[in-house]
């Protein structure tokens, strides 16, 4: 991989969004990267539910491949995000991936420290 210095005119490569609030949360770095990936997927290819709220379907195996992590690690990180109130998983039928709603922190100081 080659690297170059940034200038004022440098065009950034594709990036994933990560709210700065996330940096202070007591969750693993894997969960933080997963949140950024889920938020990116929601913005890029989210599906609207009947209320107009965006969600994604991201099977565990695909999420594990996208993050280069094991399925066990992905499940643990999803639970971390759910416990922190950052995602909501809605279970579907047998063999169908869950709907994952990515929730946004309301403001910079919203989370317990």
Describe these PLM feature segments.
Residues 42-104:
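Winged helix-turn-helix DNA-binding recognition segment
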Residues 106-113:
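Short, amphipathic alpha-helical interaction segments positioned at domain boundaries
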Residues 1-61:
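Short recognition helix of helix-turn-helix/winged-helix DNA-binding domains
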């Amino acid at each position: 991989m080659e690297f170059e210095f940034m200038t004022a005119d440098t065009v950034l490569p594709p990036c994933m969004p990560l709210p700065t609030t996330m940096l202070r949360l007591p969750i693993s770095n894997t969960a933080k990267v997963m949140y950024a990936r889920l938020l990116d997927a929601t913005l890029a290819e989210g599906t609207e539910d009947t209320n107009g709220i965006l969600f994604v379907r991201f099977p565990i195996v695909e999420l594990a491949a996208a993050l280069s992590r094991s399925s066990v690690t992905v499940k643990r990180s999803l639970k971390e995000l759910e416990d922190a109130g950052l995602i909501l998983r809605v279970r579907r039928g047998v063999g169908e991936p869950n709907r994952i709603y990515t929730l946004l922190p309301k403001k910079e100081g919203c989370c317990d420290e």
